[in-house]
Amino acid sequence: MKFSQRTLLKLKNKNKKLRPNKYKKLKRETLRGRIKGTVERPRLSVYRSNENIYAQIIDDTNSKTLISCSTLDRSIKLVISTGRTCDASRLMGEKLAKLSLKKNITKIVFDRGPYLYHGRIKAVADGARAGGLQF
């Protein structure tokens, strides 16, 4: 089932039985229908947990993960102790951009998943842009 964002919000407000995880799944499915990564422009997928943030650059045509990075990486942990800050997310975005430029990936499609473009998700995108990636 494909729902528009407006329909999802109506469902969330009207139907209290719609669980938060189900709502996130519906939002994720609507985004995946619109965002596809190709060989020329792979998809940058972001996952946010309470403690850390993870990102992957994915080629959807071949179903391969090209590059992955997280705030658990040693180089980021040495600079910033916790992975739940925007500074750690920004550093991770810059590191991801460096790794992708080594593999000659300059243009990507940003997939924020079910999360709002705010806070740590925005910090990853800003760090990747500062590192040289084009969205």
From Swiss-Prot:
Keywords: Chloroplast, Plastid, Ribonucleoprotein, Ribosomal protein, RNA-binding, rRNA-binding
Highest taxon of source: Eukaryota
Keyword Ribonucleoprotein: yes
Localization: Plastid, Chloroplast
Gene Ontology BP term (one): translation
Any one GO CC term of the record: ribonucleoprotein complex
GO MF term set: 5S rRNA binding; structural constituent of ribosome
Keyword Ribosomal protein part of the UniProt annotation: yes
Similarity comment text for this entry: Belongs to the universal ribosomal protein uL18 family.
PANTHER family noted in UniProt: 39S RIBOSOMAL PROTEIN L18, MITOCHONDRIAL, LARGE RIBOSOMAL SUBUNIT PROTEIN UL18M
Subunit structure: Part of the 50S ribosomal subunit; contacts the 5S rRNA.
Chain's role: Binds 5S rRNA, forms part of the central protuberance of the 50S subunit.
Protein name: Large ribosomal subunit protein uL18c
